[in-house]
Amino acid sequence: MHTNVRRFIKTGIAFLFVGLLIGAWMISRRELGGVWPGPYLVSAHAHAVQLGFVMFLILGVALWLFPKPPEGDARYRPERIDAAYWTLTIATAARIAGELARSAEGPDWLGWFVTAAGVAQVVGFAIYFWTMWPRIRPVGSHLREAKGQRF
């Protein structure tokens, strides 16, 4: 398993635990204190679990399992995957931190911070999928399908 794959998967697991801690905090306050979580806290929890954990695992496993890039492919370069990883990691962590700060009645400029982090997440995904696009191709499956095999 390559370094980039491990990095995506381990970062996803770290985001899972962040999401679980936020979830434990929310349920404790709701059940023991009667305080329902606000939308910013729910958003921080959702981004930690759904984007931070689920998407990072998907991206890491895709990087691991998809066919190698075609010979002479100029688009796929590990540096671009690194750029996507760091953009997504920093943006997702910033988004979660910003949402948590907003849930605590943080300053108004946090709205711009959260928005910028969200846009950076979109940029990170765009870099990843633009780089990976040539790797989404048949390698042998078109031959099996021609013989009548179905998946």
What annotation goes with each model-predicted range?
Residues 1-151:
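Hydrophobic alpha-helical transmembrane segments of multi-pass integral membrane proteins
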